[in-house]
Regions:
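Conserved phosphate-binding elements of NTP-dependent enzyme cores
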Residues: 1-835
Length: 835
């Protein structure tokens, strides 16, 4: 029943017959003007409803109102598979994995804080006279567009405007074009193996970037090409690397054929060959060919600041723009607050306005826990969670109204201490007259919602239904709800048994001593072997530096007999032979990688079907059953299961292949059956369409396949279909799938490191994950988890808490001990939330 306000405006978005991905003809009303949470186990259809229906339809309908000319220049969402969606506002989505920004992007540009800072330095700085070099006091003339009269020489000059201080514009360093780095040819990479002769390919660029006949041109230049490169004279080596571009007459014989050709050819030395290829590179592929011959260095002219000398000249309170940009946001806020008071009375009103614009933007970012980031930090180095929070802060700053914001797990990478800031941002969006739909698993976020929609009851084919809906109280009281026990605080946090402190280090230690790196102070780390160890702390406290930049590289270097990173001063890890990083990066680069291929069962399935009577009668071999290269792959989609349609004026549309219906196989494959133990006859396309759990029931006679499927089931991945493309898996699913090959082996010599493995996991899925950790620990492994999730932290044997804050105020081990000891430690911010 549609709810109508007194003024006859609709109160909810009405969704009818939604069938996107796993949704089962869903009918649901989503309240407008409220904070609506979408909950459910992983793979239950949450994102399909929020992003695949609400955002897709909201953005598509808005874009359809624009002109054709404009639409052609925008990325458009395809029409959602839904019967009807009524009253959906224009929609914006804040995705779980925002795009990684380019080389010209910094934290300051992404947040637009740098705009305010540039204006501050243009209007409020002391400027240098270009005629005599005298520094002149700040003046209102700059804001009025009037020239400054130099106090020393009396000549007029104009101060630089804000645009003249931008490293993406007029303020760019001319040497590096505003990137802060320069690319130089790495001569060591040009000839990596000096035992080879030039004829044998010693000079790599001539083989990969230039015509092969350059070897003969070098010979004509007086260089011996048939002796090892190390035996060349200094003069010959100089010709190879720096020789002049002169024409030489050569007799060229192609590799194939006996004909000779006389050619006049200009000599390209090895260095120029690379420089020429770099200048001509027009795309990523071209740059990739050249990249291995280049090395990136900090620009010597600007020192990596990206700014020209003129842009670095204005000063405010003794700092130039580059120095102010190098400060963390926390430090920059304190500095900006002090600027108006440092100026004359006539300048203060304008200074206050400019500084307030900076501080208003900064306030949101500080609430979201990003105060430790420096303004000049490269955007590409920000974590997924950091980029998402920048995106969120920018959205709330725009003060729009009547917009539908769809947030996909905004609590990713967020320490419990920063959740209140996130909730404040979402509340402000609603207060401005917007609607917010948030997909999340964090119980604190869900409890703060005005309305909850829970999808389920399980993942995959059996999910896709709305199982509970209403206020938090309504859902908590619903017997069908699977999130209800966690909303009601009735669930026990502790799933694993407690390890007595007296026995914590019975299996040994991993000890590491480091010197300072980034903002992390010198550390002495002691990790108990054969235990589950959680590394915690607020964002920017040094968790990644300690584990991913120190512990993992040091362990891997030790195993390989190589030198550890310079900042790792000592490592005691006797008996550790393997260090495995299990992260959430997507598996595979394209749709040809599936669960079956990654789990290494597809080859066994192909061989099994090739042994069937029908396959033998048709002359089909195991290789023919490959959907990538085999004769039985669908000729229409070439084994991908989908085709892309080029629609003029509209975005390309990927649709299920009309011939194979997504199975990836030609019709001939449907005629080849294999009989299971229970007498069922199945084709390979039918088996690939089954979930892991369904396939388990019909592969009992295939020992290796059955064992690997059992492992996937035990990892909580029983709902995935065998033919599911691996790049489409969530971060948590990808992590567990990567573990499949490690389960069931003795692991006493191994360390497993997980980087926020609870991303995308429902509290029930977290329990499954804890079971996986338990199995690894039981097999002897040392498991180190970088984590914010309180349930995982509470179930760890040992906790190392970094902090106390982020950036310069962090970088130390605040506390180490059992979860109970951390909870009792007054210095631990994490401990407050464990009590």
């Amino acid at each position: 029943m549609q709810r109508i306000r007194d003024d006859a405006r609709p109160e909810s978005i009405e969704v009818r017959g939604a069938r996107v991905h796993s949704l089962k003809n869903v009918d649901v009303d989503v309240p407008l003007g409220e904070l609506v949470g979408v909950a459910g186990v992983s793979g239950s259809g949450k994102s399909s409803l929020a992003l695949g229906v609400l955002y897709a339809e909201g953005s598509r309908r808005y874009l359809e109102a624009l002109s054709t000319y404009t639409r052609r220049r925008l990325t458009q969402a395809s029409r959602a598979q839904v019967d009807e969606v009524l009253h959906v506002p224009a929609a914006l989505a804040l995705h779980q994995r925002p795009a990684v920004p380019g080389i010209r992007s910094t934290f300051g540009t992404m947040t637009e804080l740098l705009n305010s800072l540039r204006l501050l330095f243009s209007r409020l700085a002391s400027h240098v006279c270009p005629h005599c070099g005298t520094r002149n006091e700040p003046t209102l003339n700059v804001a009025a567009g009037l020239p400054i009269v130099c106090a020393n020489c009396g000549k007029d000059f104009h101060a630089p405007g804000a645009e003249s201080l931008a490293f993406n514009s007029a303020g760019a360093c001319p040497a590096c074009a505003g990137t802060g780095i320069v690319r130089e040819v790495n001569r060591a990479a040009l000839v990596p193996d000096e035992s080879k002769s030039i004829d044998e390919g010693a000079v790599l660029p001539w083989g990969s970037l230039m015509w092969d006949l350059m070897k003969q041109v070098a010979g004509a230049m007086g260089v011996r090409t048939d002796v090892p490169f190390k035996d060349l004279t200094p003069k010959e080596r100089d010709i190879v690397f720096n020789g002049p571009a002169v024409k030489k007459h050569i007799l060229y014989k192609p590799k194939k054929g006996d004909d000779f050709a006389e050619l006049d050819f200009t000599y390209f030395n090895a260095v120029y060959t690379v420089e020429n290829a770099l200048a001509k590179a027009k795309d990523e592929k071209g740059l990739k060919r050249v990249a291995r011959f280049l090395e990136e260095k900090t620009c010597p002219d600007c020192g990596g600041t990206r700014l020209s000398e003129a842009a670095r000249a204005p000063r405010v309170r003794g700092l130039n723009l580059a120095e102010a940009s190098a400060m963390t946001l926390d430090a920059a806020v304190d500095w900006v607050r002090s600027v108006p008071g440092s100026l004359g009375a006539d300048m203060r009103p304008m200074a206050t306005n400019i500084c307030e614009s900076f501080l208003d933007v900064a306030r949101r970012l500080l609430e979201l826990g990003l105060g430790y980031l420096a303004l000049d930090r490269a955007g590409a180095t920000l974590s997924t969670g950091e980029r998402q929070r920048v995106q969120l802060a920018r959205a709330v700053r725009n003060r729009t109204t009547g917009v539908l914001y769809v947030l996909d797990e905004p609590s990713i990478g967020l320490h419990p201490a920063n959740v209140d800031g996130l909730l404040g941002v979402m509340r402000d969006l609603v207060a401005d007259g917007n609607s917010v739909v948030v997909v999340d698993h964090d119980v604190r976020v869900l409890k703060a919602c005005d309305h909850l929609i829970e999808m389920g009851p399980v993942a995959g084919a059996e999910g896709g239904h709305v199982i509970a809906q209403g206020t938090v109280g309504d859902v908590a009281a619903n017997p069908r709800s699977r999130i209800a026990p966690f909303l009601a605080d009735g669930e026990s946090v502790r799933e694993r048994g407690c390890m007595p402190v007296s026995h914590m280090f019975d299996l040994g230690h991993i000890r590491m001593t480091t010197s300072q790196l980034h903002t992390v102070k010198p550390l002495d780390v002691d990790i108990p072997r054969g235990r589950l160890v959680a590394v915690t702390g607020v964002s920017g406290s040094g968790k990644t530096t300690m584990v991913l930049e120190s512990l993992i590289p040091a362990l891997k270097a030790r195993s390989a007999g190589e030198k550890p990173p310079e900042h790792v001063r000592a490592l005691d890890a006797d008996g550790i032979e393997r260090a495995n990083l299990i992260d959430a990066t997507p598996i595979g680069a394209n749709v040809r990688s599936t669960v079956a291929t990654y789990a290494d069962i597809h080859d066994d399935l192909r061989r099994a079907f090739a042994r069937s009577d029908e396959a033998k009668a048709g002359g089909w071999k195991a290789g023919d059953f490959s959907y990538n290269t085999g004769r039985l792959r669908c000729p229409t989609c070439d084994g991908t299961g989908s085709i892309s349609l080029d629609v003029q004026f509209l975005p390309d549309v990927d649709i299920e292949c009309p011939d194979c219906r997504g199975s990836r196989y030609a019709p001939e494959a449907d005629a080849i059956h294999r009989t299971t133990k229970d007498g069922r006859e199945l084709t390979l396309p039918q088996l690939m369409a089954m979930s892991v759990d369904q396939a388990l029931a019909v592969t009992g006679d295939m020992r290796k396949v059955h064992a690997r499927l059992t492992t996937l089931h035990d990892l909580g991945l029983g709902y995935l279909t065998l033919g599911e493309p691996t790049p489409a898996l969530s971060g948590g699913e990808a992590q567990r799938l990567k573990l499949a090959s490690e389960m069931g082996r003795a692991q006493s010599h191994a360390v497993f490191v997980f980087d926020e493995p609870t991303i995308g996991l429902h509290p029930l899925d977290v329990r499954v994950l804890l079971g996986v950790f338990d199995r690894l620990v039981a097999s002897g492994a040392t498991v180190v988890v970088i984590e914010h999730d309180l349930d995982v932290i509470a179930n760890a044997d040992w906790v190392i808490d970094m902090g106390p804050g982020g950036g310069e105020s962090g970088g130390r081990i605040v506390a180490a001990g059992t979860p109970e000891q951390i909870a009792a430690d007054a210095n631990s911010i994490t401990g407050r939330y464990l009590r």
